[in-house]
């Protein structure tokens, strides 16, 4: 369906603002839930940009963005819930305490970064293709900038999980929260499987 010029412009402005502001806020977040929420705002901006294109390729990119964020968020939230992690400091040394939950969080972070072989990369690629196809080169540039911001906040999670030691003894995977691990791992597998397809 064709979008009117005014509607397309409004969606493009809102999407651009959301992508930039969400990415900047995610970089500065000190809480895993807030980081994921801000990353979600950035993803929502990419969805709005995709819809603003008003083309079948744009709508396909929007749908892929939604699926990509759903998988990444579930992997992050489930992996964190399995070890009752909320503050970023609690991720220090998490790779040793909770290897499966850490793997889920890692895949979620890589997908948010738009790393190759993940659904996040595929979603960003589709948006870049749709933007370039419509002559919106600036939108493609904005997606690349948002991906670079994702490298900072996603990379920070991975660095804490595998390359830092915890100052305090936090819990590992276990207890009633272990139930969150299964959907997190399924989401991580989906993120990789679709990325490889």
Sequence positions of predicted segments:
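Hydrophobic transmembrane alpha-helices and their helix-loop junctions in integral membrane proteins
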Residues: 1-122, 129-150, 155
């Amino acid at each position: 369906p064709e979008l009117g010029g005014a509607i397309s412009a409004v969606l493009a402005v809102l999407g651009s603002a959301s992508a930039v502001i969400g990415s900047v806020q995610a970089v500065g977040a000190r809480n895993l839930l807030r980081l994921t929420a801000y990353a979600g705002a950035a993803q929502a901006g990419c969805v709005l940009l995709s819809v603003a294109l008003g083309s079948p390729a744009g709508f396909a990119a929007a749908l892929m963005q939604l699926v990509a964020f759903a998988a990444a968020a579930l992997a992050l939230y489930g992996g964190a819930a399995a070890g009752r992690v909320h503050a970023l400091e609690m991720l220090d040394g998490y790779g040793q305490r909770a290897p499966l939950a850490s793997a889920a969080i890692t895949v979620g972070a890589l997908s948010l970064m738009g790393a190759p072989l993940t659904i996040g990369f595929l979603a960003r690629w589709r948006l870049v293709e749709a933007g370039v196809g419509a002559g919106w080169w600036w939108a493609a540039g904005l997606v690349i900038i948002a991906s670079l911001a994702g490298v900072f906040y996603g990379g920070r999670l991975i660095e804490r999980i595998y390359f830092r030691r915890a100052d305090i003894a936090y819990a590992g995977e276990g207890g009633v929260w272990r139930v969150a691990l299964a959907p997190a791992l399924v989401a991580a597998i989906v993120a990789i499987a679709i990325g490889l397809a």
